[in-house]
């Protein structure tokens, strides 16, 4: 599971259709998280990503150090599904998305990640799965962090959330 986490002072996601544009998620401050799911992802990956999002210390404390977490500052998450995080553009000019999980599996783990974040006491807004969306945000910092739960399988230094 991959997550691109962007610290924001405000963000929204609109669903675009023939009927028009509808805002389906909006936050005043916290993280915009673009979330991609691959074939081998499980509940364990969702727990790892949700725990990291809740506890990453990238908000400034009184001394100006990045020492506070999303939970510490009462921030929210705008969670947006993003299968293109598993694009392979190594050869040719058209990326392959074969590493992205099938829609049913991806949606289940996407919703589970949102549920786990809520379990941490975090307010979560979401995009709408399998729709064309427009994400608007104002980056803060900017701070952008890439998480990949696969790294927990190959690096002994990576901390894995217990079962």
UniProtKB/Swiss-Prot annotation:
GO biological process: D-amino acid catabolic process; tRNA metabolic process
Subcellular compartments: Cytoplasm
Catalytic activity: glycyl-tRNA(Ala) + H2O = tRNA(Ala) + glycine + H(+); a D-aminoacyl-tRNA + H2O = a tRNA + a D-alpha-amino acid + H(+)
Entry annotated with the keyword Transport: no
CDD domains xref list: Dtyr_deacylase (cd00563)
Keyword Nucleotidyltransferase attached: no
InterPro entries found in the cross-reference section: Daa-tRNA_deacyls_DTD, DTD-like_sf
GO MF term (any one): Ser(Gly)-tRNA(Ala) hydrolase activity
Family designation: Belongs to the DTD family.
Record-given protein name: D-aminoacyl-tRNA deacylase
Organism: Neisseria meningitidis serogroup B (strain ATCC BAA-335 / MC58)
């Amino acid at each position: 599971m991959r997550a691109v986490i962007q610290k924001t002072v405000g963000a929204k996601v609109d669903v675009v259709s023939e009927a028009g544009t509808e805002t389906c998620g909006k936050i005043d401050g916290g993280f915009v998280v673009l979330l991609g799911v691959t074939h081998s992802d499980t509940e364990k990956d969702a727990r790892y990503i949700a725990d990291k999002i809740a506890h990453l210390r990238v908000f400034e404390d009184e001394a100006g150090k990045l020492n506070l977490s999303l939970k510490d500052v009462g921030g929210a998450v705008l969670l947006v599904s993003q299968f293109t995080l598993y694009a392979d553009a190594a050869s040719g000019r058209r990326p392959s998305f074969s590493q992205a999980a099938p829609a049913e599996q991806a949606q289940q783990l996407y919703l589970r990640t949102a549920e786990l974040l809520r379990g941490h006491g975090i307010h979560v807004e979401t995009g709408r799965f399998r729709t064309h969306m427009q994400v608007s945000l104002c980056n803060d910092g900017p701070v952008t962090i890439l998480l990949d739960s696969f790294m927990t399988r190959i690096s002994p230094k990576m901390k894995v959330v217990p079962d």
